């Protein structure tokens, strides 16, 4: 995929977008995210990867989401951050990256998996997105295949457009930005 700079963003931002550390193409036969996506979309992306373009401005929220993952590495030293797990199923090597694996015992055998999302309030106002839950369940399966006893799953949504005034109105509007 080619990253463009239609909006003339500062070079540092464009280069940060281009240098995404996510290991595209090095994750196995299929990643958890691709596994839950529509098959035609995955096939077309793979077939036309070299022809695809995306503007750096359209990747800003993704870039900021990556910064959250870096910050999380400073939290709770016993937790494992950004761990890629692999397992085989029906001849496929499936992979998924857990944002945080929190050990519930000293042997790191019993765990809780946390997935962090930097998103809009409107993405959570009616509940968890089905694809987020699906991704967590793939991670749960991968963890179990790697010998972990998964006792809990959490999606932690960081709401970039949260408003204290709207929260005061009540209803199903989130009462905090996390």
Stretches with model-predicted labels:
Residues 1-113, 120-133:
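Metal-dependent nuclease catalytic cores that hydrolyze phosphodiester bonds in DNA/RNA
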Residues 1-8, 141-178:
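Metal-dependent nuclease catalytic regions and adjoining charged, substrate-binding loops involved
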Residues 118-121, 160-162:
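Short acidic/polar capping segments at secondary-structure boundaries
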Residues 80, 112-115, 150-157:
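A structural signal for short, well-ordered beta-strand segments and their strand-loop junctions
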Residues 115, 124-126, 164-169:
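A short secondary-structure junction signal
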Residues 132-144:
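An active-site-proximal "capping" alpha-helix that borders the catalytic cofactor pocket
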